[in-house]
Structure formats: structure tokens, C-alpha cells
């Protein structure tokens, strides 16, 4: 057997051992995590756009514009929530909305009664104060009102009582007015959320928010 044949046979049996660097198989390629669908991404973008448009506005000094900002925030929240949570919040909001409107009507009645009390107390206080001021002008009135008679005691008692009622009713009416404003804002938020949850989208939610005018901005 020739030397060339021996070398050829040796190379055939040891071909796998000729590699300088051993072969390493590539790692297993895992599938990518699922991402949000196109419509969900558009809803998220629209939600952030609406919220940014509302928060970046310089208006909102009056109560109506504050309610409008709260409505913008509720609508952005509805667009951001998943569909099951959106429907749950919608049904709960419809039930809460009825009770809030009943509470609002009750607070408005109490506020109207307090305004009448304030008006009557103010009129009586003004009348008794004017009667006390007349004592400076007329000496006869001064003698009648500064004596120990029933007229003097009645006028001073009414003045003190109506002044106290005027101050107390004013503080209570201010608190009720704050509660009315807060309840109206809550109603606006719930109504906006329910309206946004009830909307049917055609799939194209890419709205150019630069063209949307908010308030006076």
C-alpha cells in the first residue's frame, strides 16, 4: 500500500477532528412577546392626546371650565381602560349617577332655603341697626330705646339674633355651595365616562388633536 493511500484513509476516518474551534449549535430562538393591536395602540395615543390637550390649557378659572377639564380626564380614562373594565365602570357609573343627581337636588333646595334665611336676617338686622342709629338724631327715640322698656329689649334682641343667624347661614351656605360644585364635577366626570364607553369606533381613531380647540386656547 502506498503512502498516499494510507494518508487518504487516515483523513477520511478523522475528518471530524480537524476543526480548530469546536462547533457550537445556535441558541433556541424564542418567539417575541405579543404586542398591542393597532386599534388598542391608537386608543392609547388618543387618550394621552386628549388628556394632554386638557391639562396644557391655560383656561379653567370658572367652574364650568373646571368641569370641562374633569370631563376630558374621564373621557381619556375611558379610552385607556380595557373593554371589560370599561363596561363595569359604565354600569356602576349609571347607578351612581342617579343617586348623585338626587343629592344635588337636595343640596340645591337647602341652599335656596339658606339664601332666604340670609335675606330675611339681613333685612331685620338692617332695620334694627337703623332704629338704633335714629337714637343719635332724635332725643325722644334715644330715651325710648335706651330705657328698660320692652321695645328696647326687643330691638336689641332681634339685632343680636339676626346677626348671629346671618353669619351662621352664610358659612353653611358656602359649604353647601362647595359641595354642589364638587357634586356637579363628579356628575360631569361620570357622564363623560359613560358617553365615551358607549361610543362605537369605526377603527380610525387617529384624530389630529392640534386642530381641536379647548376653551379659549
UniProtKB/Swiss-Prot annotation:
Cysteines paired by S-S bonds: none
Protein name stated in the entry: Non-structural protein NS3
InterPro entries in the record: Orbi_NS3
Protein role: May play a role in the release of virions from infected cells.
Family per record: Belongs to the orbivirus NS3 family.
Amino acid at each position: 500500500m502506498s503512502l498516499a493511500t494510507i494518508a487518504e484513509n487516515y483523513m477520511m476516518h478523522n475528518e471530524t477532528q480537524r476543526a480548530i474551534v469546536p462547533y457550537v449549535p445556535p441558541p433556541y430562538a424564542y418567539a417575541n412577546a405579543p404586542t398591542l393591536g393597532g386599534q388598542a395602540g391608537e386608543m392609547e395615543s388618543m387618550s394621552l392626546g386628549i388628556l394632554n390637550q386638557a391639562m396644557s390649557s391655560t383656561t379653567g378659572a370658572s367652574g364650568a371650565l373646571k368641569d370641562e377639564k374633569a370631563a376630558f380626564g374621564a373621557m381619556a380614562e375611558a379610552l385607556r381602560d380595557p373593554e371589560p373594565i370599561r363596561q363595569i365602570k359604565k354600569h356602576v357609573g349609571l347607578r351612581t349617577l342617579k343617586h348623585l343627581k338626587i343629592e344635588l337636588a337636595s343640596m340645591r333646595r337647602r341652599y335656596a332655603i339658606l339664601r332666604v334665611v340670609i335675606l330675611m336676617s339681613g333685612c331685620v338686622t338692617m332695620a334694627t341697626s337703623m332704629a338704633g342709629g335714629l337714637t343719635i338724631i332724635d332725643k325722644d327715640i334715644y330715651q325710648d330705646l335706651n330705657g328698660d322698656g320692652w321695645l328696647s329689649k326687643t330691638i336689641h334682641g332681634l339685632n343680636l339674633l339676626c346677626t348671629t343667624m346671618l353669619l351662621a347661614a352664610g358659612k353653611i351656605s358656602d359649604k353647601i355651595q362647595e359641595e354642589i360644585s364638587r357634586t356637579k364635577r363628579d356628575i360631569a366626570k361620570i357622564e363623560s365616562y359613560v358617553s365615551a364607553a358607549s361610543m362605537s369606533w369605526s377603527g380610525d381613531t387617529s384624530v389630529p388633536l392640534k386642530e381641536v380647540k379647548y376653551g379659549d386656547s
